[in-house]
């Protein structure tokens, strides 16, 4: 049986998982990873001799109608990691982690020019462990959405318009990255570390040294290292965030004990 031909749009963690889930079930004839690849996409679609589908996951660029129209009637199929219309925008997983969610959604939708506003082909909610790592959440949602696309691409149901009030996620930037123990609970700080892993990376200043916080855990009390409590951050709720792994600016990542030995003397 001939595999359906696909142009794949995307880059980053979600795109990698969706691509890997799709690749054995479809023939991917071109990967568009950036805006400049859209021109080649147009040429392929104008010169095609067989049906070509478009599948997108985390492309990061608004695709104009002039390109979307080339893939009608199905349109470009977008795998978006939220239960739309909740958390449209560029950082749905990170925003869901920051607000303490333990249930995450994935939506397979028809792409339209307005951001994440297209009709829905398929949606699913997935429960995750309370402190699941961001990479695990990306993988689970990408596999779920990619598997559905692989199984249904050539026989898509009629999409249904989104229902309910839309909420939005924001573009992540380094201004969000710094921990604020006086303003955050210990759990909120831990959620921030999980959400900002890879980018923009959670930061804190320890004895004048700018550091990236890589992992931590919660505790009811401080956990001194050789008498030092700088890596035990008291949240506004009275609980503590205990830093387990840290990376001083310009240095390699290290465990809390190694950091204390080298910098907390």
Residues of each region from the PLM?
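One-carbon transfer enzymes
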Residues: 1-200, 239-240, 248-250, 260-265
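C-terminal active-site/capping subdomain that shapes the small-molecule cofactor and substrate pocket
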Residues: 190-265
């Amino acid at each position: 049986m001939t595999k359906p031909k696909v142009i794949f749009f995307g880059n980053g963690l979600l795109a990698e998982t969706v691509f890997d889930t799709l690749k054995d079930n479809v023939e991917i004839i071109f990967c568009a990873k950036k805006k400049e690849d859209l021109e080649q996409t147009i040429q392929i679609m104008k010169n095609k001799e067989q049906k070509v589908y478009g599948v997108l996951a985390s492309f990061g660029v608004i695709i104009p109608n002039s390109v979307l129209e080339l893939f009608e009637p199905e349109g470009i199929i977008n795998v978006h990691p939220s239960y739309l219309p909740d958390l449209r925008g560029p950082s749905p997983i990170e925003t869901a982690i920051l607000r303490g969610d333990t249930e995450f959604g994935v939506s397979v939708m028809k792409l339209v020019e307005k951001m994440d506003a297209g009709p829905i082909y398929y949606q699913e909610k997935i429960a995750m462990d309370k402190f699941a790592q961001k990479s695990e959440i990306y993988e689970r949602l990408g596999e779920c959405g990619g598997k559905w696309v692989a199984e249904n691409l050539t026989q898509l149901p009629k999409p249904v318009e989104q229902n309910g009030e839309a909420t939005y996620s924001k573009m992540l930037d380094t201004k969000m990255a710094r921990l604020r123990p006086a303003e955050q609970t210990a759990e909120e700080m831990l959620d921030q570390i999980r959400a900002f892993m890879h980018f923009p990376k959670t930061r804190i200043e320890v004895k004048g040294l700018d550091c990236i916080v890589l992992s931590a855990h919660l505790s009811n009390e401080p956990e001194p290292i050789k008498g030092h409590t700088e890596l035990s951050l008291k949240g506004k709720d009275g609980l503590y965030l205990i830093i387990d792994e840290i990376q001083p600016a310009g240095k390699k990542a290290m465990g809390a004990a190694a950091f204390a030995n080298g910098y907390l003397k």
